[in-house]
Amino acid sequence: MGFVLFHFTLIVLLASVLTSAACLSAYLVSRKRVLLFAFLAFLFYFFDVAWVLQDELMYPGLDAQMTSAYLMVRSYASILAGAGFLVSFWLVVCTVLGEKSRALMAVPGVVFVVASAVVLIVFPEGNVQRFTFYTLRALLLFWMLGFAAYRYRTTDDSVERGRLRRHLRLYVALWVLGVLVVAEDVLFFLVVDPATLGIGPWAFTSERNYAENALMLVCMFVACRDAFRTLA
């Protein structure tokens, strides 16, 4: 099982790089800002996933139970990567919806970073802290989806409604996968001890969420499709 999960991680990394490159190429051709934000999102996500492997690749002699100092440094790196790709996706949403308010575009990202840091500083170390820390990512995703639904419900422009309805399948998929992200965190932080699964120390860590990987792969497919259409 560990063999499968390791190569699944490599696939996610490769897909992140390819999607990021495709979005950058499409941006250089079209100068559409949404493609620039997508490029940044998938680039940050590449590092977010790549840092998961650092324990085994850079520090193979470390015990499965990392020191609190090491976990703290890694957590702040996770804040950087998480904020990078989530805020970039939020800017994608704002661009697609035609949102012009700079304050609205900036505040969710600032709240995410501050809340993540507060959880690390205030909460006692343990599974509840890690669960809360990583669930903030899902909350930011749900904010994006909720904001998109609000804009759809409040617009009187039938053309705009029709344009947004074309993304309905992606919208539903993101809701379903977002709920699965939280469910996986509940399972592996609060219910099951990953160490009892016996499939390798890195396969299930505080920085792994396979539902999140699946969600991102869906986004990568859509982004690549749109980027290739721009380049065609």
Describe the role of every protein-language-model region.
Residues 146-156, 161-232:
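C-terminal transmembrane-bundle signature of multipass membrane proteins
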Residues 2-4, 67-80, 201-211:
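Short aromatic-rich membrane-water interface segments that cap or initiate transmembrane helices
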Residues 1-30, 131-156, 210-226:
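First transmembrane helix
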Residues 29-42, 100-109, 160-173, 231-232:
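Membrane-interfacial loop-to-transmembrane alpha-helix junctions, especially the N-terminal start
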Residues 82-87, 93-149:
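Membrane-proximal helix-loop-helix units in multi-pass membrane proteins
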Residues 10-25, 34-62, 74-87, 110-119, ...:
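Hydrophobic alpha-helical transmembrane segments of multi-pass membrane proteins
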Residues 1-2, 59-69, 125-132, 193-200:
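Membrane-interface interhelical loops and short amphipathic "cap" helices
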Residues 1-5, 64-74, 91-102:
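Short juxtamembrane and helix-loop transition motifs at transmembrane-helix boundaries
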